[in-house]
Amino acid sequence: MQYLGVEFNMKHTPKLDPGFIPFGVWRAAYLKEAKQPVAIAVERDKGRVSVHHTCIHGTPAMAEADYRYMERYVKFLLWSTGGFRVSICGCSEIAQRLQKAYTPEGERHFDFTFVNQLFERDLEILDLPLEECPESNEVAQPIGGYMDGCRIGFDAGGSDMKVSAVVDGET
C-alpha cells in the first residue's frame, strides 16, 4: 500500500474499514528514509520538559508525509504526556502549519480547547531552530500505592480473564 508517498505493507486489511492505515506500520516505513533531524519538546507543569528526537524527509516531495508524521506525533505526545507548550525544532514549515492547526478554528481545535481547559492556559506551538531545542527536564515521581478504600481490577486477557478485589489493602 501507499500513503503520502510512503510504501508500506499490511498483513491484514480490515473488512469493515479497508482504508484504515495503522500509524505504527506507516511510521516504520516512513522513518526508513527519513534523515533530517528534528525534535519535539513538550513543556508541562513545574518546568518539566519531554524532548523527543526524530527525523523527517525534509524534501518538497515528502512535505505532506512529513507534516502528517509530525502532526500525529505531536497529538500523541499531548495526549500521552500532556503539556501546554510544544516546541517544533528544526523545521519551520511544519511548525507554522501546526501553529495554524492548533487554534480554535484549526484542524486540531478539539485538542487545542481540551489542552487549554486542562492546563488553564493557551496551548503554544513554538518554531525553534534545532540547536535551540529546550533541554529535557524529567522528574520521576511515584504513583499509586494507595491502600485505603475499595479497589477492583479486571484483566480481559487473550485466553483467560482475571478479577481481583481489595478492601483497605486486603484481598
Sequence positions of predicted segments:
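Nucleotide/phosphate-binding catalytic cleft detector across ATP-hydrolyzing
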Residues: M1-R151
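Gly/Thr-rich phosphate-binding beta-strand-loop-beta motif of the actin/hexokinase/Hsp70
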Residues: V139-G169
